[in-house]
């Protein structure tokens, strides 16, 4: 489908039956659409057709509807639509998820095996559930590149071995991460600047180079079973994003670097928890990062991740249940 010529102000859009393929950017301009009815004859769909609309609604919410675009299709041999989301006919591949998530949890079908490229880009919470969680069903075997590009997730859990392509969570805002896959691959979390708590469970055997970027990460717990790459946290930048908690000094408003901090400042924000003489302990010593010995006990680990060892806890610490 070439660039659409539909009424850009319509909320409900019906794609003509002559359309067989919906390609990248082909639905640009439908900024006010809330429902798109796809033709039963459709053979190919890419979420990149409407990804830019999700970005605009996420970043310029005062101009556009505060709702998702829901996709609908009936009597199709190739696709199934459920609650606005689009899957392949057999439900095994998620192709598109409406970006305003209701109920606080990303509703991925228990039949899904593949979370497709770009399928969950720019997802975030819909009022009143602004803080959303992503827990993948055991059926999920693969998360494709850019699947969660630009997503805003309070807590992400990856508790089984899943094939994750590079940049799967690129540019996402993820406050808390619990991960238990055998190998955490490099560049999966490229440019994620809003991590605060990360928990590597006992199932994690290795964390590869540049798996994470230094910045707003506050507490990382690493299991004694885990071997970390010498560069598993990317420290290649000279400046890093500074975390804010809803306050800003007026004295800083004219300072172009008010939202940034140096490498040394960023390292001071980070605490690694684990067992003495572990790979994590050695990494912390080598990189001059604060290390706290934490017993391999669920309650002790959770206390550490919530910042009880610090002089002042962050206000939202209790809101990220590990």
List PLM regions with ranges:
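BRCT (BRCA1 C-terminal) phosphopeptide-binding modules in DNA damage response/checkpoint, repair
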Residues: 280-283, 287-307
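Structural signature of tandem-repeat unit edges
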Residues: 1, 7-21, 30-44, 54-114, ...
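Short polybasic/polar patches that bind polyanions
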Residues: 149, 170, 285
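Short acidic, low-complexity intrinsically disordered linear motifs used
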Residues: 314-321
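Short, aromatic/basic amphipathic alpha-helical patches
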Residues: 48-54, 235-236, 279-288
């Amino acid at each position: 489908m070439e660039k659409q010529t539909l009424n850009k102000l319509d909320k409900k859009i019906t794609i003509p039956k002559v359309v067989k393929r919906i390609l990248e950017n082909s639905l640009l301009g439908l900024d006010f659409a809330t429902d798109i009815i796809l033709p039963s004859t459709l053979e190919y769909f890419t979420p990149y057709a409407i990804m830019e609309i999700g970005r605009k609604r996420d970043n310029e919410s005062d101009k556009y509807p505060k709702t998702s675009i829901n996709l609908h299709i009936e009597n199709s041999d190739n696709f199934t639509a459920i609650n606005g989301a689009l899957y392949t006919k057999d439900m095994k591949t998620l192709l598109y998820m409406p970006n305003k998530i209701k109920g606080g949890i990303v509703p991925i079908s228990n039949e899904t095996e593949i979370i497709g490229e770009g399928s969950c880009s720019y997802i975030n919470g819909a009022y009143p559930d602004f803080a959303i969680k992503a827990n993948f069903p055991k059926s999920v075997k693969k998360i494709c590149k850019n699947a969660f590009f630009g997503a805003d997730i309070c807590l992400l859990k990856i508790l089984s071995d899943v094939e994750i392509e590079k940049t799967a969570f690129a540019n996402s805002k993820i406050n808390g991460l619990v991960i238990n896959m055998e190998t955490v691959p490099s560049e999966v979390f490229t440019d994620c600047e809003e991590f605060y708590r990360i928990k590597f469970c006992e199932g994690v055997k290795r964390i590869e180079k540049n798996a994470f970027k230094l910045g707003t990460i506050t507490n990382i717990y690493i299991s004694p079973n885990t071997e970390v790459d010498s560069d598993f946290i990317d420290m290649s930048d000279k400046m890093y994003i500074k975390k804010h908690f809803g306050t800003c000094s007026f004295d800083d408003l004219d300072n172009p670097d008010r939202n940034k901090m140096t490498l040394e400042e960023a390292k001071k924000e980070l605490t690694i928890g684990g067992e003495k003489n572990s790979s994590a302990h050695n990494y912390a010593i080598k990189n001059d990062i604060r290390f706290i010995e934490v017993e391999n006990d669920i309650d002790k680990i959770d206390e550490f991740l919530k910042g009880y060892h610090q002089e002042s806890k962050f206000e939202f610490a209790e809101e990220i249940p590990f």
